[in-house]
Amino acid sequence: MILRKKLSYLWTLGLCLVASKSPPKAPSITNDRFIEECLRLHNEARTNVSPPAADMKYMSWDEALAKTAEAWAKKCKFIHNSCSSKSFKCHPTFQYAGENLWLGPLTISAAKFAINMWYDERKFYDFNTRSCSQVCGHYTQVVWAYSYKVGCAVAVCPNLGSPDSALLVCNYAPAGNYPNMSPYTNGTPCSMCQGDTCENNLCRNKERDKSQRYPNWNPSGTRQLIACNPLYLISVLLTIF
């Protein structure tokens, strides 16, 4: 029994040592620099749409969407989350959420590369006819006027390619990309703001842009059982010896 227990501790220690040699960590969903970059790139894309938008809302960060993105990214599956088609499964207050995915190396700025790549799809999209010659869905979601909340997350996924492969997931609410609809209304910037202020061609509203906390939102349904930190490793070694 004692031997079995020691072997169990050694197995745990081995897992932690392996984890300690993993690729560089992906940015956290609470990392201010990561959040700022995601918001800046999304809003720059929305500001610069052509033709100009009369009703383009400023996009602000949403904690619950980021948690959902993080939970899905950590599964390391390069497919869309099924929650996006299920009522209130991606977010506690928004009925549906949109989603964009990107897969690439973690060695570059995942958010910058991904969002710029999504925005570049505009060259395949004809606004007047709502037609697309190649892939445009990422672009239309990024500039969907009434999607005003976003939450993104990055996870390292060696199983999807190389040891530094990273999966970036961005969730949007309210969801965009509805069939037979334009992503926004063409017109003088902010002319359809309806009481909002206008900033960089985007409709802003302090109440709508406010960041909310969702402490009870746990889309993954799981908790981390082992914390592989130095103090934990020391306690394991002391227990064994």
UniProtKB/Swiss-Prot annotation:
Pfam families, per the entry: CAP (PF00188)
Cellular component, GO annotation: acrosomal vesicle; extracellular space; membrane raft; plasma membrane; protein complex involved in cell-cell adhesion; side of membrane
SMART domains associated with the record: SCP
Topology relative to the membrane: Lipid-anchor; GPI-anchor
Residues that make up the propeptide removed upon maturation: 221-241
Lipid moiety-binding region (GPI-anchor amidated serine): 220
Domain annotation SCP: ranges: 39-172
Listed GO biological process terms: fusion of sperm to egg plasma membrane involved in single fertilization; sexual reproduction
Summary of the tissues where the protein is detected: Highly expressed in testis, where it localizes to round and elongating spermatids and differentiated spermatozoa in the seminiferous tubules and epididymis (at protein level).
Assigned keywords, A-Z: Cell membrane, Cytoplasmic vesicle, Fertilization, Glycoprotein, GPI-anchor, Lipoprotein, Membrane, Signal
Entry-linked InterPro entries: Allrgn_V5/Tpx1_CS (IPR018244), CAP_dom (IPR014044), CAP_sf (IPR035940), CRISP-related (IPR001283), SCP_GLIPR-1-like (IPR034121), V5_allergen-like (IPR002413)
Post-translational modification: N-glycosylated. N-glycosylation decreases during the transit in the caput.
Localization: Cytoplasmic vesicle, Secretory vesicle, Acrosome; Cell membrane; Membrane raft
Range of residues in the leader sequence: 1-22
Location (main, coarse): cytoplasm
Record flagged with keyword Signal: yes
Assembly behavior: Part of a oolemmal binding multimeric complex (IZUMO1 complex) composed at least of IZUMO1 and GLIPR1L1; the complex assemblage is influenced by the maturation status of the male germ cell. Interacts with IZUMO1.
Role this protein plays: Required for optimal fertilization at the stage of sperm-oocyte fusion, plays a role in optimizing acrosome function, the translocation of IZUMO1 during the acrosome reaction and the fertilization process. Component of epididymosomes, one type of membranous microvesicules which mediate the transfer of lipids and proteins to spermatozoa plasma membrane during epididymal maturation. Also a component of the CD9-positive microvesicules found in the cauda region.
Family to which the UniProt record says this protein belongs: Belongs to the CRISP family.
Name of this chain's protein: GLIPR1-like protein 1
Species in which this protein is naturally found: Bos taurus (Bovine)
